[in-house]
Amino acid sequence: MKSLKVLACAACLMGTVSGVGFAKDVQTIAGSMVVPNNVNIVSASKTNTRDFVEKQMQQNPSKSTMTNMMAKEFFQNFGTNFDVYQLQGADKTGQKDAFVVAVDVKQIAQKVAKDKANDPMFVAAMAALDKGQIDPVTEQLMLGAINKQIPTTTTVVPLNDPKRYANLKTRSGELLIKPRTLTVENAEQVHPVAGTKYQTYAASSRLLYADGNVQTPLYANAAFVLKPGKPVLYVGVTTDVQRDYFKTIFDNAFKSIK
């Protein structure tokens, strides 16, 4: 819950940035991305979000020193290896908001999987990311393996195990840690996107995040852009009620990256 609060506060900080203006071509970590003229977008790396999050980590003694060190190193590459973008638009029903997270997959993989640096499969995967191209045979095998894991029906995924904390209760007898789940609905199969500068794969899904009795309907739209040497995963998230407004914006923005 602490991390969610930090993210929410960081989002508020992003929303208060003034003087951003409207833009059609927006620079992201993998290149320029096109958004409609009536959509305002701001990058978290260009705000004081980094300082805010680092301050929160310093004030949270429950985090281990190693965790804080890893997080600090992570934020040193804020705006280069990863970034968060806030999108704001509006229609006749009111203001619309969404977030896009961008992550350099190659850099993250190299940091997380250091122990696999000499593994032939890992080396081959890194070579493909450097080249920015996947051959048709490998593509079909990859998509087949990935899409087998994507639910074809509404599926509830548990995010924690409440039984582990069954003894932690409030004075009134309520569970201190509530069950958290993520329901996946109408999940789209991962597929190649035509008409892009770089090989791109995309998918989307409706989601329902539940924390006890509190439910949050969401919509996620993701694209993996294989820019040579800098493959980036983009994940756009908004509320489900704003899905129709942002779906086309996400689709076109990810497709336009160059």
What are these regions (language model features)?
Residues K46-G212:
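Conserved polar/disulfide-associated segments of primarily extracytoplasmic proteins
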Residues Y198-T200, Q215-P217, L226-Y234:
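Coil-to-beta-strand transition motifs
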Residues V35, V39-S43, T47-R50:
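N-terminal secretory signal peptides
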Residues D83-G89, T216-P228:
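Short, surface-exposed beta-strand/loop micro-motifs that present aromatic residues
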Residues A8-T16:
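Bacterial N-terminal signal peptides
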